[in-house]
């Protein structure tokens, strides 16, 4: 039996180390709700992070210390996935990183930090989804999507 042809997650031929803005989604392993929960407070959905979620957030916000060419624009963590907007700047540094290296380092560092505190083997699915931001309107659309994500939690494709 032939193996199915796997769709490549990155755009073929695109240089992910060049200056650009990206919208990224990363899911938890097996889409488990391990990062926290959504709770209604005064009729409004709020995300309440678990200890794993706190570690993930802390790791994420410390990433620019390692990757000075990446600027975090917006971020939203939900029970089983996260979305973020990031700008890859073209600055003069010796070691230039791609979006995949940035995301890979984040997943590895957060995974290790979680394992140091608890006996969870895996917190992330393989790979990640990305969208290359094409213009200001596209950036605003994805910014708003992240901003309103917690309010749409019950309708979210990752709600499962």
Where would I find each of the regions flagged by the language model?
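Short catalytic/metal-binding and nucleic-acid-binding patches
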Residues: 1-160
